[in-house]
Amino acid sequence: MLIWKTKNNKNDKSRKICYNIKPVVIINCDYTITEKIYKIGGLMQKRVELLAPAGNMEKLKTAIHFGADACFVGGSSFNLRGMSSNFKNKELKEAIDYVHSLGKKIYVTLNIFAHNTEIDYLPRFIKMLAEYGADAAIVADLGVFQLVREHAPNLPIHVSTQANNTNWMSVKTWKDMGAKRVILAREMSLKEIKTIREKVPDVEIEVFIHGAMCMAYSGRCLLSNYFTNRDSNRGICAQDCRWNYKVIAEGHEDKGAHDIVEEHGETFIFNAKDLCSIEFIDQIIEAGVNSLKIEGRMKSIYYNNSSKTI
């Protein structure tokens, strides 16, 4: 169920889509996520970017309509959402032109861990992104990072959370290598984020504020490979962690084999709760973050626009 509060009139075009989506419950709260970001950002004399997912052109347009400052998208290959519709090359050009016409930004994911068979094909795609005018390439693999530097030296690089950026020295190293932005690991605390900002003040920092969590550090899980032969680091994760499991611990001589139960007779050891940081957005911004990211390129338009509006 979508829950939000809007100050706009029903006839206001900027909220027209809201009232075409049901069910809708209006509640009494001070402001939406977008308004909260801008209000806090204004007090700090800086604009904090709201970065939204877009799995296709329709999702891109509605994300911008609902207040996103930038969108991240994937091409037909080389990204971690292989099961999404994504953007064909011609659609990427259309998407970039559309976003730029509205004064917004668009980042393209190149965040697979590349194998040898892909290295020869990446340069052409990278050059195309630079030619089209993409605002950045999101990269996780060190080899792909170097390819972007060589074949599109003016294309900004954002280092993906898949690179497991958990400390200030890693962030500084990426910055020294030429990265414009580093996307921190989801497992970071506010204190750690503040330390990174203090130690590396001259690089953009991006964090996830909403969406799915991985049971392991991003990219370090092999459940999908093991159970379904689908590589999570190549965009086809089966999300096996969300299956129902009965976990049994063995090897305890005093107790023997026994079920592992957390609550209500179930265990959630393989499935982290989804991330929702709305109550901490002000603290995240105060920690020095430049961009707040919503996960969900494969989610529905309804889900994505709800998360940007709540």
Regions found by a protein language model. Name each.
Residues 22-43:
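Short, Lys/Arg-enriched N-terminal segments with co-localized hydrophobic residues
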Residues 41-165, 184, 192-291, 298-310:
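Active-site pocket-lining/capping segments in soluble small-molecule metabolic enzymes
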